[in-house]
Regions:
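Cytosolic regulatory regions built on CNB/CRP/Popeye-like sensor folds
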Residues: 2-23, 27, 31, 38, ...
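Short acidic/polar micro-motifs centered on Gly/Asp/Asn
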Residues: 55-59
Length: 475
């Protein structure tokens, strides 16, 4: 059974000629890679990623002039296609050749910034073309090698530039806004894109590993990756249910650890940025399905940008909060009781809270400050027996904390402590009453959860000298 989202119409399900070129490059087969990438440009001179790969191979072979021509053209084609990451990648290659890239960075920033006249409502833009199946695609002849191959690739780049220049009198295409970048004005975008470097990864490469601490954010310039989370499959009795739902991969045994595919990331996707807001371990892995070109920025580089351009830091924090809210809207058991269209406005009542490792969200014997939805990180519910503390349960993103004391109107009977740096959205106690009055379904959901958790917790505390079940939860 499939444990991944279904393939979408028009999605890439087989290696493209450019995939082949990237794979050959990563394997060190540079001439073979050039035959495939240059042939891709010859077939479709609008393909920015092929222009950039061909130019990179020319640069490696010492053809700097042709490479510069190709990188500059690739940047322009990428902008016209609305692919900011590929445009930035091209500028990175130009910088490596010693080219002054200031005007190129300004061009990208002007195209994608908040006030750009080229930005348009995505609904008004024509749909992107379907991927070329490439059934009749042929790379350049294997008889071409050495200087002859380089000259042919140079000619293809030059002809591609001539075709672009022939369109000089036409209006440039409108493009869709890009998350985060198109919420910032030109100078801020200029500073932000300068923080990113380009990397190329092969199929199967683990870009982010679940459980590791992260300090980087990534953008997919070209390629496809999967977000995967390790999970322990259900008990044998649940096999049929899991297989029917497609949640148990074929050949996996219930009770074993398997990877559940949560999402696919394609061109333009920004991921890993939550590590910039929280130093919690990564909640999932990200693995390349195809050879991919990525942009990467480290936390310290982005923090330097935020210091120099405070508006960038403000928007980056707002972007991360929007992402947290969007995730909680989809996954929080509290919000599921509310109609989907009402959830975003409801979450806006919550305040963002950050906790360092060891901080207490809730203290035993005290009133809770409010209801917490865990956005990132991890907390431990801690009880005490004979003067010794023990962990009753751990809770992570999507879980709710504090509902027992609020709903049952009593003091907390356990500590809740941040295991890692943690970010929550908190609904203050004084706003809780108005929330449940407006949305009684939330009260019903929380009451059921609170009673269940309270009963389980009482059982654990009463028998704390015996082994503790991992799924007992107290909040």
């Amino acid at each position: 059974m499939r444990a991944a989202p279904p393939d979408l119409p028009g999605s890439q399900t087989t290696d493209s000629p450019l995939d082949r070129a990237l794979a050959l490059l990563l394997a060190g087969e540079r001439e073979a890679a050039l035959r495939w990438s240059a042939a891709t440009v010859d077939r479709d001179p609008q393909t920015a990623s092929a222009l950039i790969l061909t130019s990179r191979l020319l640069a490696d072979a010492g053809r700097s002039e042709a490479a510069t021509e190709g990188f500059e053209l690739g940047m322009k084609r990428a902008i016209d296609a609305g692919n900011l990451p590929i445009a930035v990648a091209a500028v990175g290659d130009l910088r490596a050749l010693g080219v002054d890239v200031q005007k190129h960075l300004d061009t990208i920033a002007a195209a994608f910034c908040k006030s750009s006249p080229r930005l348009s409502d995505p609904a008004m833009l024509p749909p992107p073309p379907l991927p070329d199946p490439g059934h009749d695609f042929q790379p350049l002849s294997s008889f071409l090698s050495g200087p002859l191959l380089l000259s042919k690739a140079t000619q293809i780049i030059h002809e591609a530039r001539q075709k672009y220049e022939a369109l000089a009198g036409h209006d440039r295409a409108l493009i869709a806004p890009v998350a985060l970048f198109s919420q910032i004005e030109r100078a801020g975008v200029r500073a932000l894109i300068g923080a990113f470097d380009m990397i190329t990864v092969p199929a199967g490469a683990v870009v982010i590993a679940e459980g590791e601490e992260g300090a980087e954010a990534y953008i997919v310039a070209r390629g496809e990756l999967e977000v995967r989370r390790a999970q322990r499959d259900a008990e044998p009795a649940s096999r049929a249910t899991l297989e029917t739902a497609g949640a148990l991969p074929e050949g996996a045994e219930p009770g074993s650890l398997t990877d559940l595919t949560l999402a696919r990331l394609t061109n333009g996707a920004l991921f890993g940025e939550m590590a910039l807001l929280s130093r919690a371990p990564r909640a999932a892995s990200v693995v390349a399905c195809r050879p991919s070109i990525l942009l990467v920025a480290r936390r310290d580089a982005l923090e330097a940008v935020a210091v120099a351009r405070p508006e960038v830091g403000v928007e980056l924090a707002a972007h991360c909060r929007r992402r947290m809210v969007a995730n909680l809207v989809r996954t929080s058991p509290v919000l599921i009781a509310v109609a989907p269209e009402e959830r975003p406005a409801l979450v806006e009542r919550f305040e963002t809270r950050t906790f360092e490792k060891g901080d207490k969200l809730i203290a035993v014997g005290e009133d809770t400050s409010g209801l917490h939805l865990i956005a990132s990180g991890e907390v431990a519910v801690v009880g005490e027996d004979g003067g010794e503390s023990f962990v009753i349960s751990t809770l992570g993103p999507g879980d709710v904390v504090g509902e027992v004391a609020l709903v049952l109107r009593r003091k907390a009977n356990a500590d809740v402590i941040a295991v890692h740096p943690t970010v929550t959205l908190e609904l203050p106690r004084e706003h809780f009453l108005s929330l449940i009055q407006e949305h009684p379904a939330i009260l019903l959901s929380l009451y059921s959860l609170a009673v269940q958790r309270d009963e389980e917790t009482s059982s654990v505390l009463a028998n704390s000298t015996t082994s503790l079940a991992d799924d007992y939860v107290l909040v």
